[in-house]
A protein has these predicted regions:
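A short, exposed loop/beta-hairpin motif centered on an aromatic-Gly-Thr core
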Residues: 16-27
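Short, mixed-charge low-complexity intrinsically disordered segments
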Residues: 38-52
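A structural detector for beta-sheet-dominated domains
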Residues: 9, 27, 49-52
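Short aromatic-glycine-(Arg/Gly/Cys) micro-motifs in beta-strand/loop hairpins
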Residues: 1-17
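Low-complexity, intrinsically disordered Gly/Pro/Thr-rich segments
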Residues: 28-37
Length: 52
């Protein structure tokens, strides 16, 4: 398992955006993408940084 810092920008229903940063403990980057649903249309952008 690795530790990742995940920062994502979500588009809200009113068109505004919201930035959220979380820490994830996952096997790899692909698991982070799947776990947080980062390929969903409401996600404007994201960054994943491995911190361990």
């Amino acid at each position: 398992m690795h530790t990742y810092k995940v920062t994502m920008v979500e588009r809200q229903k009113d068109g505004s955006t919201h930035t959220l940063t979380q820490t994830a403990h996952c096997r790899d980057r692909q698991e982070v993408i799947e776990w947080y649903g980062l390929e969903q249309p409401d996600i404007v952008s994201y960054t994943i940084v491995q911190i361990d």
